[in-house]
Amino acid sequence: MSQFGSREPGLVGAALELHNLSAGIIADGFHVDVSTIKVALRAKKTPGSIFLVSDSMATTGTNLKSFELNGRKIFRKNGRLTLENGTLAGADLDLATSVRFMVHEVGIPYIDALKMATIFPSRFIGMEKEIGVLLPGARADFLWLDESLNVRRVWRSGEALI
């Protein structure tokens, strides 16, 4: 993605400046710094214009320390996925971790962080009546988070998984 610069605002600048444009943020402190997230939230005041995405690999939640992808070795350490040279190679977080990050590191209210992971992205893709909500006729995908925002239980289509 193009970087934000004083002479060339790039994609980030366009996302922040255009009020009718929504943007997803990987809230892990590696892809986007806490200060940058705060600036983005101040710039995009319309509810739902910033939402959480994970960019996570299938290894998220496993004990794997490394894996191969397209012939390249990916290393996992301290919440980061990197190439051998240290270049960021993807995210190693689920959305519950992003919600915790937004609450504890960025300092936004719990309910706002939950909306950024649920209803806001479902509205963005036009599925707000099916996913990201608990309404009659919706899929009934939801989770139970404890007071520390850790996942305690998961339901998909109304069926308990864990």
Give the positions of each predicted feature:
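A general structural motif at alpha-helix termini
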Residues: 117-118, 138
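Active-site-adjacent C-terminal substructures of enzyme catalytic domains
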Residues: 1-112, 117, 123-128, 145-150
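C-terminal cap of metal-dependent C-N hydrolases
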Residues: 123, 133-162
